[in-house]
Amino acid sequence: MALTFQEILDRIRIIDRDVTELNRLKSRLPADRPYSSSLQISFDKQINELLNERVGLMELEVLDPPSWILGVPTTGISQETPVPLKGLFPSGDLSKEKPDDQDVINFLRELPKTEIHLHLEACVNKDTMKRLMAKNGINVTDEEFEAKFNFKDLNSFIQVFFFIQSLVKEPSDFSFFIESLAEYMRANNILYTEVFFAPSKFIQNGLDFEEMIDFLVNRIREEKENDGIVIRLLVDVSRSFGPENAMKNLDRVLKLRHPEVIGIGLGGAELMGPARDYQGVFQKAREAGLRVVAHSGEDDGPWAIWEAVELLKAERIGHGTSAIQDPELVKYLRENHIPIEICVTSNVFTGKYVRKEQNHPVRYYYDQGLPLSINTDDPEIFNVNLTYEYYKLWRFLDFSLDEIVDLIRQGVFASFHPNKESLWAEMEKNIHLVKTRYGLKR
């Protein structure tokens, strides 16, 4: 879709104004009022929706690029020839003492990134869900549909996943999932991602595991061939269905021969399934050469993380929010180079240990030298994206832009990418170019 330059510019101005005002109101919320957490969530949803819309607008092409715009010549360009909008704007100056928020967001978006804690179902946007519902004859009113996403805690949040999974009726439906994931990666300049795929509910609904994986892998290969983005799968053996089901899922994985499937994860309702119940599953996976990660410390205390690292030998910890309660655990994670997959917005939304970004332990973890990666967890459910996750670190948790670049580097080396050094070397070259455009020292 191509619009006129003025139409797009007017809408972007309104979005920037509204985002600035919402951030101002959010910063003034008192911390000790019963309504504060719900208002913060409301502000976050509005801000994230606006920023996602802005990203979409910048991807559009304009029909009438004016010759005077920022000194960019348009001689020879037909008024009927669409031109990418983002190419018409200069980069902001981030060397200023107080750079503009929107310039920071634009800078962060342009930086190449990786993301390694991401659920496939939660990458499907609502419009795509509705297309899938229409395809499969699923009738849900708009009110019923929106009510599905009004979760109050982690358990009710998991029900959202079950709803999304229920929309899939045949393996080819996963084309909608990979299409949305690839669009999300491109919009945030994510070059490599490790995404969780939870098969249990799909299998209960009558789908065949190998057929699902075959279709997912074929679509993943198509996206890589299209523009080079790399997607790898971690099969979530899941707490939600018990240890016996988890072992069955592992056995299914072990029969595969796809290099795109690199390991397993343990997700689901943390309080329903302590890590010790899955020790045998993880031992068998490790012995088979699979990579192993576990959600832990999201809805339970630091003892749960101890079990994940000591009994499961998890190579990374998803969320790890409660680790801050145990200094010995923080020391152990640092000394054993076990990364924490940080998901700031997700932790605020589920609200067990964190109600405001300012209170998230990521700043403490970074200062303590823990290896970290920054992630969204569930971008379409939380209306967030990876660019804005990094922006929150700058805006609310006092991370400098250089520290954010360091976090991007840490994310690469926390991944299971087979050639981390070469991936980072290529990313670093591009980061230097972006920093130069924005007036920052290399």
UniProtKB/Swiss-Prot annotation:
Its cofactor is Zn(2+). The keyword Membrane does not apply. Its EC number is 3.5.4.46. It catalyses: 3',5'-cyclic AMP + H2O + H(+) = 3',5'-cyclic IMP + NH4(+). Keywords: Hydrolase, Metal-binding, Zinc. The keyword Oxidoreductase does not apply. Disulfide bonds: none annotated. InterPro entries: A/AMP_deam_AS (IPR006650), A_deaminase_dom (IPR001365), Ado/ade_deaminase (IPR006330), Metal_Hydrolase (IPR032466). One of its GO terms (molecular function) is cAMP deaminase activity. GO terms for biological process: purine ribonucleoside monophosphate biosynthetic process. Deaminates cAMP into cIMP, thereby repressing cAMP dependent metabolism or genes. PANTHER family: ADENINE DEAMINASE (PTHR43114:SF6). Belongs to the metallo-dependent hydrolases superfamily. Adenosine and AMP deaminases family. This is Cyclic adenylate deaminase. It comes from Leptospira interrogans serogroup Icterohaemorrhagiae serovar copenhageni (strain Fiocruz L1-130).
